[in-house]
């Protein structure tokens, strides 16, 4: 009977709907939530003081200047932060709302969530009852790509509209599974930069990603529609935390990668693409002029002004420029030649077969005409009926010589940056005639000649014979006026210092004289031009001899002499000058060879000369990341030991007669196509430490080398590339080690490149994924140093 009495009640309980999940306010007003380890903070923020626009976002928690990595309501800001909330609704969604604006943002999860997690990686995750994610911020990024964030073909990182406006901008980073590459895209449709195809080891256009201590990359299911890509940053050792790093699509359309420097408490730009801002599609807008030589990339030509002054001041140039005196079509309009320029995209045109004067007359009579260009030989006239975008100087064979319609009311309007600069600088030139004479007298004491830009332009035949290009600028071969002596003229790009600072540093460099340093003969510091004139080195740079397919072959005797001479030159910079000079860019391209193949170190002092900070120095090392010491990335202070590391990497290349990083295995010899040899240092380190030095030596030498010198030089190289800068020898000691004055023992294996040899791939295609709650594989150390010591001496200091 009791069972009969309670049975209907039990049935009733089963028939009732489950209790609803109660709504939960997660954040209200100025409240914040910290992630595990307090690395990230979730809360409301405003980009400027006094702004009425507030956003829910994720930022780094402990930094003096807020750095936002994700924004929820980037399209609809809230205006009343005090009543604004982040809430988990009873229906299982995350929403941002307030009393005044209502719901301004909501997650789009397909299944209801019951709770949330805020991970130490900066990922906001909505989970269900069994803890599985139903939505996460990593799948819905804004402009930032964090370590551990899995990028698919459905994921896009879109820039902010401007520095202070988080709303979606014009530029996005996307993974294209069909092309197996990342692309930077303008307005979702126009690609303007790509990484190139995935080779199984790296993207073709980004060889630096193969350096093991910077990232660990994983490409899952490449060449398929479900392809995904993610990365992590391994710690430098077993006790330190991984470096804070992030990729960001800037509002200016460049993809940048930053690392955090705990010493200076600031972000350092480690990498960016495209390097030339003028390659960014439509950066300067209609009738805006783009030049990488300006302090800011975009300018309006005289006679034009920004359409949006406020946006222009905040580095948003997308609205472009307009005529100062209204639209074209007035009787007072006239024409001025722009010169050979190119522009982005297509422009609506009308084609005619008329003379130049008739072409101009036709344009002037058409209210829609912006300008024209005319080909004299064929009388081809093209009338521009739309304003061209992102004007820039023409390069190569693509040239569109445009004549723009300008109004002359109030001023002489000349559209053409090449014409504008002399007009701006006329007043300055009179003042500098007097100072140049004083400069010539002062620098003559240092045997430095002060050149005019016109003199160097003439000496290089209009900068026509380009013999090299480095991070600091292009190098041209020339002949000094009234002489048959060849010189190398380096035209510096993006000068970072004022004229007085530039001349002071030139004075310092000119005072440095050493047989293994390239001699500075003179310079030019005129207007925006910064040029350095060096002795010309007829045998070129060491880099031209480091290819197995090159017909040039250096004997072992020459290689050893180059190594010793380079070491002496660097040691003089570190220890022989009044002020220690850290080169910051030791690599084969900066080791030049005179007619007798003696080594001459070039580009010394340029990092300081151009005001290069961490970001700008590393920006010069595009394609040469194999020489960058770990402390560049870890945030430790940069000392002379950074040059020692780079020198050690260069020694390995000199011994092997090849580059350290080779993405395309076709450039290797037939016997050297093993997968591990795509990155030479870890394999070479293992062979050298285990006593198999002969296997590392350039096979083209056919055994014609001094075994004792090879062993000594190879062992010194491994000492130089130690992870811990404290156990790397000073350059003065390196010289003595190479000379045989200081004996050398077998060094410990470098831990960072050791991880690569152990089989923990940084280059291959991974079949695993890195998900929340499951740590990505750690660095392994599978290479141990032999117990026996070398027969030639004590450990080096």
Curated annotation (Swiss-Prot):
Coiled coil: none
GO biological process assignments: recognition of pollen
Protein name as annotated: G-type lectin S-receptor-like serine/threonine-protein kinase SD2-2
Organism: Arabidopsis thaliana (Mouse-ear cress)
Annotated positions binding ATP: 467-475, 490
Domain EGF-like per the UniProt entry, residue ranges: 274-310
Membrane topology: Single-pass type I membrane protein
Signal peptide range in chain numbering: 1-23
Cytoplasm among keywords: no
Domain Protein kinase: 461-742
A GO cellular-component term linked to this record: plasma membrane
Low complexity: bias regions: 784-797
Extracellular compartment segments: 24-401
